Design a protein with these regions (language model features):
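Conserved small/polar residues in nucleotide/adenosyl-binding loops
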Residues: 196-197
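Short, solvent-exposed loop/turn and secondary-structure capping segments
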Residues: 73-78, 161-166, 175
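Extended hydrophobic secondary-structure segments that form protein cores and membrane-embedded regions
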Residues: 62-65, 148-153, 179-182
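N-terminal regions that are enriched for targeting/export leaders
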Residues: 23-117, 129-130
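Loop-to-helix element that buttresses phosphate recognition and phosphoryl-transfer chemistry
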Residues: 113-137, 150-154, 165
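Bacterial Sec-dependent N-terminal signal peptides
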Residues: 1-23
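Extracellular/periplasmic catalytic domains that process cell-envelope and extracellular macromolecules
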Residues: 54-58, 143, 158
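Structured segments of extracytoplasmic/periplasmic soluble domains
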Residues: 71, 84, 130-141, 165-168, ...
């Protein structure tokens, strides 16, 4: 009997333990941008990097990155919403907030039209920033005129991300020798999933 009481009390404590944790709702309201999922541009608050142990010096870097921030995959992902708001606007069915949203949406559409899936200016800045931080953190690797082999998938936003990264490195050290290539040859190891729908 005593064992049952101990087990029951233990089970109750375990069940109640999560109640003190932060809820998803609280976290979403604290940082609503996180609710964007893959559309949330990663934050720029970077923790300091761990120093190499004594006696060790960087001599090589292998970097595997994903494309920077992009526009939605296709214009249709914007257009259906623009059309919906336009129809409601013409029917005088929008509230003041709806009209404000419609005007903002038209500005977004003006910028985004024709850029479906492309790298955004923010995406370019992100990759330039990664290159800059890498260069500042490991200057020994970039001294002189080392050779850099840069490879990308055939998806344009990925190739443009690679070039933004490499261009920033070249600005920091014009003597770098960078070989760029985006081809089918590297698709198997750079992106093993089907990319034909992009």
């Amino acid at each position: 009997m005593k064992l049952k009481q101990i087990l029951l009390c233990g089970l109750m404590v375990l069940c109640c333990a999560p109640l003190g944790a932060q809820t998803s709702k609280e976290e979403m309201f604290a940082t609503p941008e996180k609710t964007g999922g893959v559309y949330w541009a990663y934050p720029l608050d970077f923790a300091p990097q761990t120093k190499a142990p004594k006696g060790y010096k960087p001599f090589y870097i292998s970097h595997y990155g994903r494309h920077g921030s992009r526009y939605l995959i296709g214009d249709r992902d914007y257009k259906w919403l623009v059309d919906l708001f336009e129809e409601a606007h013409r029917a005088h069915a929008l509230t003041g907030l709806g009209e404000d949203t419609y005007r903002r949406l038209l500005k977004v559409w003006e910028e985004a039209e024709g850029h479906g899936g492309d790298l955004t200016p923010l995406g370019v800045r992100q990759h330039r920033g990664i290159a800059e931080r890498m260069y500042a953190s490991f200057p020994e690797v970039f001294k002189g005129n080392p050779f850099i082999s840069a490879r990308s998938t055939v998806v344009l936003r990925c190739a443009m991300s690679m070039v933004a990264f490499g261009d920033r490195l070249k600005e920091l050290n014009p003597d770098l020798r960078i070989s760029y290539e985006a081809s089918e040859k590297y698709m198997d190891y750079l992106n093993s999933v089907s990319y034909t729908h992009l």
